[in-house]
Protein backbone atom coordinates (compact mmCIF):
# COMPACT_ATOMS: atom_id res chain seq x y z
CA UNK A 1 0.00 0.00 0.00
CA UNK A 2 1.11 3.57 -0.65
CA UNK A 3 -0.13 6.99 0.36
CA UNK A 4 -1.67 7.48 -3.08
CA UNK A 5 -3.71 4.26 -2.84
CA UNK A 6 -6.16 4.23 0.06
CA UNK A 7 -6.78 0.64 1.18
CA UNK A 8 -10.15 -0.90 0.38
CA UNK A 9 -11.70 -3.77 2.33
CA UNK A 10 -14.69 -5.13 0.41
CA UNK A 11 -17.00 -7.90 1.57
CA UNK A 12 -18.63 -10.20 -0.99
CA UNK A 13 -21.67 -11.80 0.62
CA UNK A 14 -22.36 -13.92 -2.47
CA UNK A 15 -25.78 -15.66 -2.25
CA UNK A 16 -26.13 -15.14 1.48
CA UNK A 17 -28.21 -12.85 3.64
CA UNK A 18 -31.83 -11.96 4.34
CA UNK A 19 -33.24 -8.71 5.70
CA UNK A 20 -32.45 -9.85 9.24
CA UNK A 21 -28.76 -9.53 8.34
CA UNK A 22 -29.08 -5.76 8.70
CA UNK A 23 -28.01 -6.20 12.30
CA UNK A 24 -24.56 -7.39 11.15
CA UNK A 25 -24.39 -4.50 8.69
CA UNK A 26 -25.18 -1.95 11.39
CA UNK A 27 -22.51 -3.43 13.62
CA UNK A 28 -19.97 -3.04 10.84
CA UNK A 29 -21.01 0.54 10.09
CA UNK A 30 -20.81 1.45 13.77
CA UNK A 31 -17.32 0.00 14.13
CA UNK A 32 -15.56 1.89 11.35
CA UNK A 33 -14.68 5.09 13.19
CA UNK A 34 -11.00 5.88 13.00
CA UNK A 35 -10.13 3.24 10.41
CA UNK A 36 -7.81 4.25 7.57
CA UNK A 37 -9.33 1.90 5.00
CA UNK A 38 -12.38 2.39 2.82
CA UNK A 39 -14.94 -0.33 3.44
CA UNK A 40 -17.70 -1.81 1.35
CA UNK A 41 -20.23 -4.63 1.60
CA UNK A 42 -21.61 -6.25 -1.57
CA UNK A 43 -24.83 -8.05 -0.59
CA UNK A 44 -27.27 -9.85 -2.89
CA UNK A 45 -29.26 -7.49 -5.10
CA UNK A 46 -32.40 -7.98 -2.99
CA UNK A 47 -30.69 -6.24 -0.07
CA UNK A 48 -28.88 -3.38 -1.80
CA UNK A 49 -31.66 -0.81 -1.48
CA UNK A 50 -32.37 -1.53 2.18
CA UNK A 51 -28.70 -1.74 3.09
CA UNK A 52 -27.80 1.48 1.27
CA UNK A 53 -30.55 3.33 3.10
CA UNK A 54 -29.50 1.83 6.42
CA UNK A 55 -25.86 2.93 6.19
CA UNK A 56 -26.47 6.33 4.58
CA UNK A 57 -24.25 8.90 6.25
CA UNK A 58 -21.74 6.31 7.49
CA UNK A 59 -18.33 5.34 6.08
CA UNK A 60 -19.64 2.00 4.78
CA UNK A 61 -20.29 1.74 1.05
CA UNK A 62 -22.63 -0.71 -0.67
CA UNK A 63 -21.80 -2.50 -3.92
CA UNK A 64 -23.29 -5.07 -6.26
CA UNK A 65 -22.00 -8.50 -7.24
CA UNK A 66 -22.60 -8.44 -11.00
CA UNK A 67 -24.40 -6.54 -13.74
CA UNK A 68 -25.61 -7.08 -17.30
CA UNK A 69 -23.82 -5.16 -20.07
CA UNK A 70 -27.07 -3.64 -21.37
CA UNK A 71 -28.83 -0.69 -19.78
CA UNK A 72 -32.25 -2.34 -20.09
CA UNK A 73 -34.16 -4.79 -22.26
CA UNK A 74 -35.40 -8.36 -22.57
CA UNK A 75 -32.91 -10.03 -20.22
CA UNK A 76 -35.02 -11.97 -17.74
CA UNK A 77 -33.46 -12.24 -14.31
CA UNK A 78 -30.57 -9.88 -15.05
CA UNK A 79 -29.71 -6.59 -13.36
CA UNK A 80 -28.23 -3.58 -15.15
CA UNK A 81 -25.53 -1.31 -13.78
CA UNK A 82 -28.07 1.51 -13.81
CA UNK A 83 -30.39 -0.54 -11.59
CA UNK A 84 -27.56 -1.12 -9.14
CA UNK A 85 -26.81 2.59 -9.03
CA UNK A 86 -30.50 3.43 -8.63
CA UNK A 87 -30.74 1.00 -5.71
CA UNK A 88 -27.86 2.71 -3.92
CA UNK A 89 -24.74 0.81 -5.00
CA UNK A 90 -21.54 2.72 -5.72
CA UNK A 91 -19.48 -0.19 -7.07
CA UNK A 92 -19.85 -3.66 -8.57
CA UNK A 93 -17.80 -6.85 -8.52
CA UNK A 94 -17.21 -8.18 -12.04
CA UNK A 95 -15.54 -11.29 -13.41
CA UNK A 96 -15.58 -13.25 -10.16
CA UNK A 97 -14.44 -16.83 -10.76
CA UNK A 98 -17.84 -18.13 -9.66
CA UNK A 99 -19.42 -16.09 -12.46
CA UNK A 100 -16.73 -17.12 -14.92
CA UNK A 101 -17.21 -20.81 -14.06
CA UNK A 102 -20.92 -21.11 -13.21
CA UNK A 103 -22.07 -18.86 -16.05
CA UNK A 104 -19.23 -19.42 -18.53
CA UNK A 105 -18.33 -15.74 -18.57
CA UNK A 106 -15.15 -15.01 -20.50
CA UNK A 107 -12.96 -11.94 -20.57
CA UNK A 108 -14.98 -10.33 -23.38
CA UNK A 109 -18.22 -10.31 -21.39
CA UNK A 110 -16.37 -9.03 -18.31
CA UNK A 111 -14.96 -6.21 -20.42
CA UNK A 112 -18.45 -5.30 -21.62
CA UNK A 113 -19.69 -5.26 -18.03
CA UNK A 114 -16.85 -2.94 -16.99
CA UNK A 115 -17.96 -0.52 -19.70
CA UNK A 116 -21.51 -0.80 -18.35
CA UNK A 117 -20.31 0.01 -14.84
CA UNK A 118 -18.52 3.09 -16.11
CA UNK A 119 -21.61 4.11 -18.06
CA UNK A 120 -23.66 4.02 -14.84
CA UNK A 121 -21.04 5.74 -12.70
CA UNK A 122 -20.12 2.61 -10.72
CA UNK A 123 -16.63 1.57 -9.66
CA UNK A 124 -15.85 -1.87 -11.15
CA UNK A 125 -13.89 -4.35 -9.03
CA UNK A 126 -12.53 -6.70 -11.69
CA UNK A 127 -11.59 -10.17 -10.45
CA UNK A 128 -8.78 -12.25 -11.93
CA UNK A 129 -7.12 -15.47 -10.80
CA UNK A 130 -5.64 -18.80 -11.79
CA UNK A 131 -6.67 -22.41 -11.20
CA UNK A 132 -4.55 -24.83 -9.18
CA UNK A 133 -3.46 -26.55 -12.40
CA UNK A 134 -2.27 -23.21 -13.79
CA UNK A 135 -0.53 -22.37 -10.51
CA UNK A 136 1.29 -25.71 -10.41
CA UNK A 137 2.35 -25.24 -14.04
CA UNK A 138 3.99 -21.93 -13.14
CA UNK A 139 1.48 -19.98 -15.24
CA UNK A 140 -0.21 -17.88 -12.55
CA UNK A 141 1.31 -14.54 -13.52
CA UNK A 142 0.78 -15.15 -17.23
CA UNK A 143 -2.87 -16.17 -16.76
CA UNK A 144 -3.67 -13.18 -14.58
CA UNK A 145 -1.84 -10.77 -16.88
CA UNK A 146 -3.87 -12.04 -19.82
CA UNK A 147 -7.11 -11.63 -17.87
CA UNK A 148 -6.25 -8.03 -16.98
CA UNK A 149 -5.30 -7.30 -20.57
CA UNK A 150 -8.51 -8.76 -21.99
CA UNK A 151 -11.05 -7.90 -19.26
CA UNK A 152 -10.21 -4.23 -18.70
CA UNK A 153 -11.13 -1.71 -21.42
CA UNK A 154 -8.95 1.19 -22.48
CA UNK A 155 -9.30 4.38 -20.52
CA UNK A 156 -9.05 3.05 -16.96
CA UNK A 157 -7.95 5.54 -14.33
CA UNK A 158 -6.98 5.44 -10.68
CA UNK A 159 -10.51 6.40 -9.66
CA UNK A 160 -12.38 4.20 -12.15
CA UNK A 161 -10.89 0.74 -11.58
CA UNK A 162 -10.03 -1.74 -8.85
CA UNK A 163 -8.46 -5.13 -9.57
CA UNK A 164 -8.97 -8.09 -7.22
CA UNK A 165 -6.59 -11.04 -7.45
CA UNK A 166 -8.37 -14.18 -6.26
CA UNK A 167 -6.56 -17.45 -6.93
CA UNK A 168 -9.45 -19.78 -7.72
CA UNK A 169 -7.99 -22.64 -5.69
CA UNK A 170 -7.92 -20.46 -2.55
CA UNK A 171 -11.54 -19.27 -2.61
CA UNK A 172 -13.49 -20.81 0.25
CA UNK A 173 -10.92 -23.56 0.76
CA UNK A 174 -9.02 -22.17 3.72
CA UNK A 175 -5.83 -22.34 1.64
CA UNK A 176 -3.89 -19.21 0.80
CA UNK A 177 -0.79 -18.63 -1.32
CA UNK A 178 2.35 -17.45 0.41
CA UNK A 179 2.93 -13.74 0.68
CA UNK A 180 5.78 -14.16 -1.82
CA UNK A 181 3.33 -15.76 -4.28
CA UNK A 182 0.88 -12.91 -3.75
CA UNK A 183 3.60 -10.30 -4.20
CA UNK A 184 4.72 -11.92 -7.46
CA UNK A 185 1.24 -11.89 -9.00
CA UNK A 186 0.35 -8.43 -7.71
CA UNK A 187 3.64 -7.18 -9.14
CA UNK A 188 2.73 -8.69 -12.51
CA UNK A 189 -0.66 -6.99 -12.36
CA UNK A 190 0.95 -3.65 -11.51
CA UNK A 191 3.32 -4.11 -14.46
CA UNK A 192 0.57 -4.75 -17.01
CA UNK A 193 -1.45 -1.84 -15.63
CA UNK A 194 1.57 0.45 -16.02
CA UNK A 195 2.16 -0.87 -19.52
CA UNK A 196 -1.44 -0.08 -20.49
CA UNK A 197 -2.30 3.01 -18.47
CA UNK A 198 1.00 4.71 -17.68
CA UNK A 199 1.16 6.87 -14.57
CA UNK A 200 -2.51 6.18 -13.78
CA UNK A 201 -1.49 2.64 -12.81
CA UNK A 202 0.26 3.96 -9.72
CA UNK A 203 -3.12 4.85 -8.24
CA UNK A 204 -5.12 1.76 -9.26
CA UNK A 205 -5.77 -0.43 -6.24
CA UNK A 206 -5.12 -4.17 -6.36
CA UNK A 207 -6.94 -6.22 -3.73
CA UNK A 208 -6.17 -9.76 -2.61
CA UNK A 209 -9.02 -12.23 -2.15
CA UNK A 210 -9.22 -15.91 -1.31
CA UNK A 211 -9.72 -17.19 2.25
CA UNK A 212 -8.87 -13.84 3.84
CA UNK A 213 -9.46 -14.13 7.59
CA UNK A 214 -8.63 -12.12 10.70
CA UNK A 215 -5.63 -14.33 11.45
CA UNK A 216 -3.93 -13.89 8.06
CA UNK A 217 -5.12 -10.42 7.08
CA UNK A 218 -2.22 -8.44 8.54
CA UNK A 219 0.43 -10.43 6.68
CA UNK A 220 -1.47 -10.30 3.40
CA UNK A 221 -2.22 -6.58 3.68
CA UNK A 222 1.44 -5.81 4.41
CA UNK A 223 2.52 -7.49 1.16
CA UNK A 224 3.92 -5.37 -1.68
CA UNK A 225 1.27 -4.04 -4.07
CA UNK A 226 -1.62 -5.32 -1.93
CA UNK A 227 -4.00 -2.40 -1.46
CA UNK A 228 -6.78 -4.14 0.42
CA UNK A 229 -8.85 -7.30 0.40
CA UNK A 230 -11.93 -8.80 -1.20
CA UNK A 231 -13.36 -10.86 1.64
CA UNK A 232 -15.81 -13.72 1.20
CA UNK A 233 -17.12 -15.82 4.07
CA UNK A 234 -15.46 -13.74 6.78
CA UNK A 235 -17.43 -10.68 5.67
CA UNK A 236 -20.69 -12.29 6.82
CA UNK A 237 -19.69 -11.81 10.46
CA UNK A 238 -19.28 -8.22 11.58
CA UNK A 239 -16.56 -9.05 14.10
CA UNK A 240 -14.44 -10.84 11.49
CA UNK A 241 -14.90 -8.17 8.84
CA UNK A 242 -14.00 -5.41 11.27
CA UNK A 243 -10.94 -7.33 12.45
CA UNK A 244 -9.74 -7.56 8.85
CA UNK A 245 -10.39 -3.85 8.28
CA UNK A 246 -8.44 -3.03 11.43
CA UNK A 247 -5.49 -5.09 10.19
CA UNK A 248 -4.67 -2.39 7.65
CA UNK A 249 -1.40 -0.84 8.72
From Swiss-Prot:
GO terms for biological process: gluconeogenesis; glyceraldehyde-3-phosphate biosynthetic process; glycerol catabolic process; glycolytic process. Belongs to the triosephosphate isomerase family. The lineage of its organism: Bacteria, Pseudomonadati, Pseudomonadota, Alphaproteobacteria, Hyphomicrobiales. Homodimer. Disulfide bonds: none annotated. Pathway: Carbohydrate biosynthesis; gluconeogenesis; Carbohydrate degradation; glycolysis; D-glyceraldehyde 3-phosphate from glycerone phosphate: step 1/1. Involved in the gluconeogenesis. Catalyzes stereospecifically the conversion of dihydroxyacetone phosphate (DHAP) to D-glyceraldehyde-3-phosphate (G3P). The keyword Cell division does not apply. It catalyses: D-glyceraldehyde 3-phosphate = dihydroxyacetone phosphate. One of its GO terms (cellular component) is cytosol. Keywords: Cytoplasm, Gluconeogenesis, Glycolysis, Isomerase. This is Triosephosphate isomerase. Substrate binds at residues 12-14, 172, 211, 232-233. The active site is at 96 (electrophile), 166 (proton acceptor). It holds the Pfam family TIM. It comes from Xanthobacter flavus. It comes from the Bacteria. GO terms for molecular function: triose-phosphate isomerase activity. Its main location: cytoplasm.
